C-alpha cells in the first residue's frame, strides 16, 4: 500500500466489489475487494499521512479478541434482530402457523413497485390481479402485539386523479369513459420512446368512472360531473396529469399512494391495526421472497385491515443513538476534516441502543478504527469492534444497522454532520450502494439532501426507509431558546449534566498515541451518544410527532421533515373527500395574489396583504396596574366565527346578489379589493369544521390528563393535545403561503383584517363603557372598600396582534386579578361571535413599555417578564445582560427607585430625582469592573447566528463573519449554518506573529472581532470602551421609556460617569448638576 498525504486529493475510488445475498437484496453479504484507507499511525506509528491501497480479502473486524468475518451471524457483537441473515437457521423454511399474528402496530409506511412478471411464480392469484402489468404496493412496517417484527404488504392501491368531464370532452371530442381510456393509452404509447414501460399501456390499464364532485374554490362552485381516472401504475397517472389535455385542470393527481391508502380508507399512518376475519385470503411470504428485514411478511389487501381506535400503547421499538468522530489526515492534521477528502477519515462511531418501551439502555457498541482500550469504568459495559480500515469501519456500522434494524435513530446534529459525512464517504469515496440498508432490502429510499433554501438552512433532509430520524439538535433548536446550542451547554441546561469536552484538534494526537489514548476518544464519542439518548427521553419528540402523524394522516417521517403545509393539506383532503369536494393541483386561481406573483419574501410567505394591527404603545413606566386581555386561539376562532374558507368565498357580487349582507354573507375590503364570505347557514366552511372538530378533540384530551392512570399516559395525552394546537395554528399560515400546497390569500388577509378590527372594537368598548368608575364598581369590584369616588381612570395603552393592555388607576391589583375573567367575558359577550373569546391573561403591577413588541413588567405573582428587549437577546454578552438586569431589578423591586423612575419623564433631565442614585452606583460599579486586569473573557462573549452560508450575505463586514474567516484561515472547525458564532471585541493593534489570518485591521468594529479561545490563548486585551458603550446603548434603549427618549437616557446613564472632556458645554452642565444630585450615594 502506498503512503498518501495529499490534502487536496478528491478522486472517487473504484466502487466496492461486493454483492447481496440474492437478486432481491442490495445490502452487502460478500465483498471480494475494497479500498483500504487508514492513518499511517496504525501501520508505522507516523502521526501524519494516510495509507491508501487495494485489498482483495473479505472485510473483517475484531471483537472480544476474536477476528471475525464482517458478515457472519454469530460474532456476538450485537443482537441479530434480522432473523433471516444468510447462514442463519431462521433462513430455512419455517412453520407458518408459528408466524401468524392478529394485531400489529405500524410506525412507518413505505411504497414499492412490483410487476406481474417478477411475481408470477409465487404471488397468490388474489394479489396478481392488482398488477396489470404492474402496481404500487403499500408496505406497513411495525411490530405485532406478540413481539414479531412485521411487514404487511397491501396490494390493490390505485392512484387516481379527477378532471371535469365537460372540459375533457370538449378538449378531445369524446363523451364516455371508454373513449377516454383509449385516448389516454394512446397518449402513453406515443411517449414510449421516453419511457419504455408506456408501450404496454392499453385501455384496460385504466378504471374510469363518472362521479359528482365540487371544486373547493369559491362559493359559486357547484356539483358537476368529473372523470375519476384510476390506474395500477403511479407512473401513468403522473405522466397524464402533466401531459394529457394540458389546458384542463387536474385534481388530486399528486396524492401519493400512502396518503390515498390512509385517507380513502380512514386508516392510520401510525397506530394499531388488526386483520379482519373472513375478509379474503392473506399470504405469508416465504423467507426467500422477503423484501424487507422484517421477520414476518404478509400480503393482503385493504379489505383485510381495520384500525384499533383508542389503543395508545407502544410496542418494544428500539432507539439507536449514534455519534461519529473524524480526523484530518493530510499534511495538516489539525485542520477540520471534510468528507470530500479521502485522507480525512472517520475514526470512531458510538452506538447506544435503548428500548422505547422501558426507556433503558440495552446495548452500547463502539466501532473503532484501530485498536481501542476504553477506560476501566466503562469497558465492561461496551462492546468494541476494531476495524483495520475506514471502509471496514463504515461497513461494520452499516451491517449492524441492517442486522439490528432499529426503528428510530437519534443523535446530536446527526442531520447537520454525521449522516452527511458518512453518506459522502460511503457513496462518493467508496462507491457503496445504500438502498438496501433501511428496512427495504433493495431499492429503498436512503437520501441525505441539503434543504433547498439557498444556503439558509443547516439541517439536511435524511430519509431512510423504515428508520425515523430524530436529531436532538434540531428539536432543541426549535423548542428551546438558548445562547449556545453546543452539546455541553445544552446538556447542562436541559439535563443538569456537564460534558467532558474534547477538541477535534486533540483527536489526531490522541489517535496516534495508541489504544489507550484512542480509548479516551471512544469514551468521549460514547458520551455524546448517551447524552443524546437522555435528551431524547427528556423531550420525548416521538410522542408529539407520532400524534401529529396520526392526526394529520401522514407518516411519522413526513411529520418530522415535511413542515406544516402537508399536515393541513392531508387533513383538508380527508374532510373534502367526505363531502364530495376535490382539491386542484397547485392552484393558480387565488385572484387576490394574481397581480402580486413577485410580492413575497425569501421564505415564500406572501406579503401581499397587511399584517396584524398593533395599537401604538403609551411609552413610559407605568406604576398603575396593567391588565392584559388575550384572545384565545385568535386566528382559528376568526376563521370559525366568520365561516372563512375557499368554498365560502367569492369575488363575484352576482353570486351573492340574492343574499342579504351581514345576515347571509360578510363583505370584506382589504387594500382596495372586495370579496365576500357566505355565512354558515348558507354553506359551512370546511376549515371551520376542521378547527371545530380539532378544538373539541383537544378539549376532551386536556380533560383526560388529570384522570390518566400513569405518567406515560399523561405525557401521551399532553403530546396529543399539543399536536392539535400546532395544526390548528397552522391553518392561517397554510392559506397565506403563496407558493404553498393550496393557497388562498383572501382568507389570510381577511383573518388579519378582522383581527385588526377586533383590537379597535375592544379599545373603544373599554374606553366608552368603563370610563366611569360607578359603571363598573358594582359589576366587577363590589367588595372593594372605599370612601367616596377613588381617583379612577382607565386607558388602553397597547394592542399587540391578539393582546390588549389596559391600565387601571385607583383599582387594587388584587381586585383586578379576581375580576379579570368577568371583565373579559363582558367584552366577549358584547362584541364578538363565538367561538371568539377574550381572556384575562395576567396583571402587571409595574410595566415598562418601551416600544411596539418591547416591554418589561412584573406580574402580580412577582415574576418579571420581558419581551423583545435587548438584555434578553442571545447576541448580548453576560456583562451587559447582568448589569442591565441588576438595574431593572432596582427599578421594579426597589420602591424608591421605582417612584423616581415613574416621575423621571416629567422632570428636567438636569435635575433628576434623588431616588435614582442607586442606579448611578450600579453603573459606576460596572464601569470600574471594566478597568480590572482580571476580566473573565467568557463574561464578554457575544454570539450571532450564521443564518446562511457566508457567500449569501450582502456584506462581509459583520463581527461573526470576521471570526468565521479567521477560523477558516487558522484551519479550525468551521461553523455551520444555524450555528451561533462566539466572538469578543478586542483592543486595536494586537496582531499575533504567525497568525495565518491576513486581513488588515480597519476602523470598523467588526475588524476587531476575535475568537474567545484565541483571545484566552494569546492573552489579548478586551476593548473596554466598546463594552461600556455597548452597555450604555442597551440601557438607553431599555430605559428610553423612563427618560422620554433613547438620547436622553444615554445622557443620563453617561452622567453617572462624568467625563468633561468628551461632551459639549451644555451636556457638561447637565452632568455636573447630576453629579451633585447623586453625591450622597
From Swiss-Prot:
What the entry lists under SUPFAM superfamilies is as follows: DNA/RNA polymerases (SSF56672), Ribonuclease H-like (SSF53098)
Broad class of where this protein is predominantly found: host cell
Q: Which domain of life is it from?
A: Viruses
Reaction(s) the record says it catalyses: DNA(n) + a 2'-deoxyribonucleoside 5'-triphosphate = DNA(n+1) + diphosphate; Endonucleolytic cleavage to 5'-phosphomonoester
Q: Where in the cell is it found?
A: Host nucleus
Protein name, UniProt field: DNA polymerase catalytic subunit
Q: Which GO terms describe its cellular component?
A: host cell nucleus
Q: What does this protein do?
A: Replicates viral genomic DNA. The replication complex is composed of six viral proteins: the DNA polymerase, processivity factor, primase, primase-associated factor, helicase, and ssDNA-binding protein. Additionally, the polymerase contains an intrinsic ribonuclease H (RNase H) activity that specifically degrades RNA/DNA heteroduplexes or duplex DNA substrates in the 5' to 3' direction. Therefore, it can catalyze the excision of the RNA primers that initiate the synthesis of Okazaki fragments at a replication fork during viral DNA replication.
Keywords tagged on the record? DNA replication, DNA-binding, DNA-directed DNA polymerase, Endonuclease, Host nucleus, Hydrolase, Multifunctional enzyme, Nuclease, Nucleotidyltransferase, Transferase, Viral DNA replication
**Gene Ontology biological process terms in this record:** DNA-templated DNA replication; viral DNA genome replication
Q: Which family does it belong to?
A: Belongs to the DNA polymerase type-B family.
E.C. number, please?
A: 2.7.7.7, 3.1.26.4
Q: Species name for this entry?
A: Psittacid herpesvirus 1 (isolate Amazon parrot/-/97-0001/1997) (PsHV-1)
Pfam families, sorted: DNA_pol_B, DNA_pol_B_exo1
Cross-referenced PROSITE patterns: DNA_POLYMERASE_B (PS00116)
GO MF annotations, alphabetized: DNA binding; DNA-directed DNA polymerase activity; nucleotide binding; RNA-DNA hybrid ribonuclease activity
Subunit info here reads:
Forms a complex with the ssDNA-binding protein UL29, the DNA polymerase processivity factor, and the alkaline exonuclease. Interacts with the putative helicase-primase complex subunit UL8; this interaction may coordinate leading and lagging strand DNA synthesis at the replication fork.
